[in-house]
């Protein structure tokens, strides 16, 4: 059975996909069989044949060098750049939680490590019609631990603490925070690091600078954050 983790963020465009690509690259460099998974992906472009390109999955594969087929990375792909629940209302093909879990479980049987990435922040809805499906439904169904990606700049204390506290209230285990767009020596970024650790009780396990092509984090530490979840 694989070891897994879920990558969430303090909001949209904080760099979850960028950081996830660097994480998968680390596993690839260590010779580990690692997979990427995203339940639902919106804001994708079309190929000349009309099919949708899973943009985040393609980015992760290009950055990391993993050989996982794109079609194995995401079961729900939408064109409109909105939350998956709204994209499905506009385009059809709403998310089915059983399908999401079955796809994830298959990857868990085939790979040593599975890194799942969320859409937007922790409260992003996957479906909101006759059925209501949140990201946390997927996380809780497989008892996944989480890493929080946060921007290192202004406003991150509030965003990181609210995210961590919500996860705690829902029984979701946060294993640490990764700062993105971090500038060493920047007084604001350094203070944000101290304050986020103090106010959330979580460690900033890595800081990613603009343009980094590698994750500055010992592999043993990264690997220790992954745990065996529950698979049906």
Where are these regions (language model features)?
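N-terminal phosphate/diphosphate-binding loop that engages ATP/GTP or pyrophosphate donors
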Residues: 4, 18-94, 98, 103-106
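Hydrophobic anchor at the beta1->P-loop junction of P-loop NTPases
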Residues: 7
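Conserved glycine(s) of the Walker
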Residues: 14-15
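Histidine-anchored nucleotide/phosphate-binding helix
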Residues: 24-25, 135-138, 158-169
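Switch II (G3) loop of P-loop NTPases
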Residues: 100, 104-131
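Inter-motif core of Ras-like GTPase G domains
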Residues: 128-152
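Charged helix-capping and loop-helix junction motifs
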Residues: 128-136, 161-164, 189-194
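C-terminal lobe/tail of nucleotide-utilizing enzymes
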Residues: 165-232
């Amino acid at each position: 059975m694989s070891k897994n983790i879920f990558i969430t963020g303090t909001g949209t465009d904080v760099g979850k996909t960028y950081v996830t690509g660097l994480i998968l690259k680390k596993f690839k460099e260590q010779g580990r069989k690692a997979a990427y998974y995203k339940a639902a992906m919106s804001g994708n472009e079309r190929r000349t044949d009309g099919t949708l390109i899973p943009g985040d999955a393609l980015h992760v594969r290009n950055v990391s060098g993993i050989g996982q087929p794109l079609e194995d990375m995401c079961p729900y792909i939408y064109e409109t750049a909105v939350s998956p629940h709204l994209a499905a209302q506009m385009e059809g093909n709403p998310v089915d939680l059983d399908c999401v879990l079955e796809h994830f479980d298959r990857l868990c049987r085939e790979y040593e490590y599975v890194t799942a990435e969320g859409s937007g922040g922790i409260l992003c809805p996957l479906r909101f019609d006759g059925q209501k499906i949140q990201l946390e439904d997927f996380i809780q169904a497989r008892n996944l631990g989480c890493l929080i990606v946060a921007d290192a700049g202004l406003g991150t204390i509030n965003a990181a603490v609210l995210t961590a506290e919500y996860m705690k209230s829902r029984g979701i285990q946060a294993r640490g925070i990764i700062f993105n767009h971090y500038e060493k020596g920047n007084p604001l970024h350094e203070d944000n690091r101290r304050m986020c650790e103090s106010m959330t009780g979580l460690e900033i396990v890595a800081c990613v600078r603009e343009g980094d092509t590698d994750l500055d984090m010992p592999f043993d530490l990264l690997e220790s954050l992954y745990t065996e979840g529950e698979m049906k």
